[in-house]
Amino acid sequence: MDRTTLPYGLFGLDIDPYKEFGATVELLSFLPSDFFPSVRDLLDTASALYRESLESSDHCSPHHTALRQAILCWGELMTLATWVGNNLEDPASRDLVVNYVNTNLGLKIRQLLWFHISCLTFGRETVLEYLVSFGVWIRTPPAYRPPNAPILSTLPETTVVRRRGRSPRRRTPSPRRRRSQSPRRRRSASPASQC
């Protein structure tokens, strides 16, 4: 693949927006395009789960920052699409631009939003394990693989892919302590706890 056809190639730079998070564009490309929810659904999810931390001036995590940037980028694309729709005279050209934005750029934004929301929700390691598991599953001939693809929300309990290094120690359950009959005081939430 030459630099002009790289999905995120720009000005001769081979920039992969997932690299710093341990993933790659290729790893996400194993997931079919219809796997990713609509941009609207992903934005609603991000807003419902992470609105406070996304709107906060505090730096919460690289995933929050990447999510903010993807949301802002989509907003700018929608502004451009609206401008094109209002100013391009030729309906065929207008449709080509709108379809290109929705199909190509929309998919990239859906992938970015899904990846960062999933990392915040399930943890980066779990999402990476899921991507590897799905990649292995999809490349295995149907006769030799389980009928159903791995599911992200159940992956921590059923994954076959293991992290390198020591396996986590199992703790033996401690005896139950008697609970105090008096109500506990709740600490007030600090600004850092929003993240």
Curated annotation (Swiss-Prot):
A Gene Ontology BP annotation from the UniProt entry: microtubule-dependent intracellular transport of viral material towards nucleus
Ranges for region 3 X 7 AA repeats of S-P-R-R-R-[PR]-S: 167-188
GO CC field: host cell; host cell cytoplasm; T=4 icosahedral viral capsid
Lipoprotein found in the keyword field: no
Modified residues (Phosphoserine): S167, S174, S182
RNA binding, as annotated region: 189-195
Region Disordered, annotated ranges: 148-195
Function: Self assembles to form an icosahedral capsid. Most capsids appear to be large particles with an icosahedral symmetry of T=4 and consist of 240 copies of capsid protein, though a fraction forms smaller T=3 particles consisting of 180 capsid proteins. Entering capsids are transported along microtubules to the nucleus. Phosphorylation of the capsid is thought to induce exposure of nuclear localization signal in the C-terminal portion of the capsid protein that allows binding to the nuclear pore complex via the importin (karyopherin-) alpha and beta.
UniProt modification remark: Phosphorylated by host SRPK1, SRPK2, and maybe protein kinase C or GAPDH. Phosphorylation is critical for pregenomic RNA packaging. Protein kinase C phosphorylation is stimulated by HBx protein and may play a role in transport of the viral genome to the nucleus at the late step during the viral replication cycle.
Keyword terms: Capsid protein, Cytoplasmic inwards viral transport, DNA-binding, Host cytoplasm, Host-virus interaction, Microtubular inwards viral transport, Phosphoprotein, Repeat, RNA-binding, T=4 icosahedral capsid protein, Viral penetration into host nucleus, Virion, Virus entry into host cell
Motif Bipartite nuclear localization signal, chain ranges: 170-187
Entries under Gene3D superfamilies matching the protein: Viral capsid, core domain supefamily, Hepatitis B virus (1.10.4090.10)
UniProt GO molecular function: DNA binding; RNA binding; structural molecule activity
Pfam families (UniProt xref): Hepatitis_core
Biased composition (Basic residues): 161-188
Subcellular location as annotated: Virion; Host cytoplasm
Record-given protein name: Capsid protein
Sequence repeat extents: 167-172, 174-180, 182-188
Family listed: Belongs to the orthohepadnavirus core antigen family.
Subunit structure: Homodimerizes, then multimerizes. Interacts with cytosol exposed regions of viral L glycoprotein present in the reticulum-to-Golgi compartment. Interacts with human FLNB. Phosphorylated form interacts with host importin alpha; this interaction depends on the exposure of the NLS, which itself depends upon genome maturation and/or phosphorylation of the capsid protein. Interacts with host NUP153.
Family matches, as InterPro entries: Hepatitis_core, Viral_capsid_core_dom_sf_HBV
Family matches, as HAMAP family: HBV_HBEAG
